[in-house]
């Protein structure tokens, strides 16, 4: 699980600093891998090699929104829904994160590594 602390200015002009959480479960990663012929990781590698910026941006948006969620109070669940992802995508915090990933290769790689399950190979 990746926690990103983001400072942004909301639509009322108020500066906010908030924590946002991103995670992909083993099941989600497996589903992504099996949903693309040849595997998701191979497709990702090919897109990056091709320098298809439009596709890279589209893929990052998809990954950020798929990984976004909220931890339950007891820490047992990581709650995700289309509604939560859509609401998050309408914030300046999302815009800050998206721009960081779009403009900084190291930040993008750290994000992808951070959202992957720690024990994926096990």
Predicted regions mapped to residue ranges:
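Acidic, aromatic-enriched beta-alpha/helix-loop junctions
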Residues: 28-62
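Short, charged/polar N-terminal "headpieces" of proteins
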Residues: 1-42, 108-122
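A contiguous, well-structured "functional interface" segment within a domain
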Residues: 1-4, 64, 77-81
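Generic structural signal for hydrophobic core residues of well-folded globular domains
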Residues: 47, 67-68, 101
């Amino acid at each position: 699980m990746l926690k990103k602390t983001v400072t942004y200015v909301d639509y009322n002009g108020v500066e906010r600093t908030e924590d946002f959480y991103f995670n992909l479960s083993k099941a989600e990663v497996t589903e992504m891998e099996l949903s693309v012929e040849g595997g998701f990781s191979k497709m990702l590698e090919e897109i990056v090699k091709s320098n298809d910026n439009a596709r890279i941006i589209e893929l990052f948006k998809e990954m950020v929104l798929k990984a976004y969620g909220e931890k339950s109070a007891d820490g047992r669940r990581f709650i995700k829904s289309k509604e939560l992802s859509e609401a998050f995508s309408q914030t300046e915090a999302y815009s800050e994160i998206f721009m960081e990933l779009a403009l900084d290769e190291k930040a993008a790689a750290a994000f992808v590594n951070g959202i992957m399950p720690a024990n994926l190979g096990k």
